[in-house]
Amino acid sequence: MAAARKFREVIDREGLRGEELIRALLPTLAELYGAALDLEDVRPADSPDHKFAMSHDQWDALFRQLGERIGPNACYWTMFDPTEPDQHDDHPVAGHLGDDLADIYRDIVPALKAWDGGDDSIAAGAVDSWRMTFGFHWGAHSVDALRTLHWLEMNK
């Protein structure tokens, strides 16, 4: 929970820009990724965090804002599936830190808001939502973002 809150605080702090934002994101994103690996397998009856979901317009605004805050190095190249390069003609694909961070935020923050509601069933749904979406979505975005942020920090 603490790692999710830290991530949200860094993203929501609009004054963080450029190198300062990159420096704040590195430990925060690494901590969030590590915490996700330890999430318990909780299977609630339902996951009621949908009422806190971000709209596409909200996501798009965050994506654009993060791209501007990161600056000209927001775009990067990566392999979609680094274990099977032949499936993709061995060509890298473009990534964008604004997309990575906005997608992580979209997967994390609604569940955090649900958790803050104090209802145990909502809390269980929040944990399950994080664990599930980590496995198939925001975990990969975290790794791509960390690799790129690391490179930007070490090669400035």
Model regions and ranges:
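N-terminal interaction modules that seed assembly of large macromolecular complexes
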Residues: M1-H56
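Long amphipathic alpha-helical segments
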Residues: D41-L112
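Acidic, proline/glycine-rich low-complexity IDRs
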Residues: D89-G95, A102-K156
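Charged, amphipathic alpha-helical oligomerization/scaffolding segments
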Residues: A2-K6, A24-E31, A35, A61, ...
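Short glycine-rich, low-complexity/disordered patches
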Residues: L16-L25, A45-P48, W77-E84, I122-D128
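Residue-level signal for secondary-structure boundary elements
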Residues: D12-G15, E19, L37, P44, ...
